[in-house]
Structures are given as structure tokens and as C-alpha cells.
Amino acid sequence: EQLYPSQYVYKYPKAGEKNSEVRLYIYQIEEDKKVACDLGEETDIYIPRIRCNPFDNSLLVYRLNRLQNHLEFLRFDQQNGQSELLYEESNKAYIEIGDYFQFLKTRNAFLFTSEKSGYTHVYLFDGDSRKTVQLTKGNFDITDLNGVDETHQYLYYTSSEESSMERNPYRIGLNGEGKTLLCPEAGWHDVQYSRGFQYFMDRYSYLNHPALYAIRNSSGELIRVLKDNHALINKMKEYELSSMELIQVPNEAGDQ
């Protein structure tokens, strides 16, 4: 907003100084009072995420230790501030906090991402059974969560499963079954779903082809091509440009 850079000052402890202690409160508007949340005896912690559960009006809080290698999901009762441990994971080195998190509207459950398998995957926590189910599995990363169709019990996502140099959209049941590749064309797909997930727009491109825009149904079947950039393709042919190609170089271990 400013034309010139300005100095930003924030508290950061110097060596030997005590870290700031994090406290969490729930403010009850009707009763005009605040309820202290019990974060445990350890005060040298982070609270990287706070979520409000619309299903039971509780508070879900991420608690992360100072070393950032032990993460816990805590449920707080808004009346008394008491906590319940729902989920936890540990790592010898570091835990990356994922930004994707979604409560389901029709059941007491939520979706979140984790790298605990070595890759970014989607997990479902069931609030009734207190069990966590891994929905997506494999040696690839989930790169985008496109939405949840609770009516038909599907999760829509984009991943690098076909190739680390490509992005393809998929859908999978909320029970972890019935995975379907929606757009098999090699390249990069950027999708946007309609309300109700009946259709989606696919913006698709690859190295030697400009962006193509198309409408597909929820199963990935092509409904209509909106723009194929045919004129641009013909124009590019006039310049007789060399074709581009991506290659993978293996190392001694065979990794690429």
C-alpha cells in the first residue's frame, strides 16, 4: 500500500531470552466472558492453526512443539475450555503444516493433508469413531484439493501421479475407494468445478500446445471445447519453431 518500504518491528527472542507464552481463549458474547483453553503444561509451543467446527460448535486447534516435529489436533469445549486429543503425528526432523483443512457438513468428520507417508496425501478423521483413514496413497503428491461433493461422497483433487512434470485431476470416494482419473491427457490441467460438482472447466496445456479450454462432466467426459486456440497453433507453425521436450536424468540410485 505504501510507495516506499518501511521498517516492520516484531518481537523475536535473543539467545538466552524466554520465548513468548501462547494463551488461547474462547470469548462467549452472550455471557460476556472469556474461557481459557487448557493447552497443557508445556508452554513453549506454537498454535499454527485454529478451526471452528460447525458440527458441534467446538474449537479445533493445532498444537505444535517448539522443535516443530510433534503435531497434535486438539478439540476444545467452548463451555469449559477442556481439551481432547483427536490426532497426533511425529517426525524426527520437521512437520510441514498443510493449509488444506475442511470440516464435512453432513457428518462429524474433517479432511486434512499430511506428509507423514513421505508424500502429501489426504486423510479423513471420523469424529464418531475417532479413527483416521488415509484416502489417497502412492509415491506422488496431492498438489491441489478441488472440492468435496458430500451428496455423492467424492473428493476431487489434482496430483502428480502420472508424472512429476504433469498435473491431472482425479476423484475418489470418501471411503478411499473408486479412484478415477478425470483427464488422462498428458500435460498440465487447471480445473474449476461448478456448484454441485456436475461439471468442471478444464484449462489444459502442454509444451507444444497453447491452452485449451473445455467443459467436462463429473466423470471427465468432454461436453464442449470452449476455446482450442486453433488460430494461434497455425500461426506458430509458420515460424517453424523447434519442438520442446522434457527429459528426466537418472542418478546412480536410479532416481530421476
What are these regions (language model features)?
Residues 21-23, 68-75, 118-123, 164-170, ...:
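Structural motif
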Residues 9-23, 38-64, 70-75, 85-113, ...:
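Conserved beta-propeller blade repeats
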Residues 70-72, 199-226:
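Structured, non-catalytic alpha/beta "coupling" segments that mediate domain-domain communication
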Residues 1-36, 219-234:
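Predominantly five- to eight-bladed beta-propeller fold
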Residues 227-256:
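N-terminal cap/lid segment of alpha/beta-hydrolase-fold proteins
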Residues 67, 116, 163-164, 176, ...:
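Short flexible coil/turn linkers enriched for glycine and charged/polar residues
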Residues 28-32, 77-81, 126-130, 173-177, ...:
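Short loop/turn segments that connect beta-strands within beta-propeller blades
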Residues 35-38, 83-88, 132-137, 180-184, ...:
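Beta-propeller fold detector
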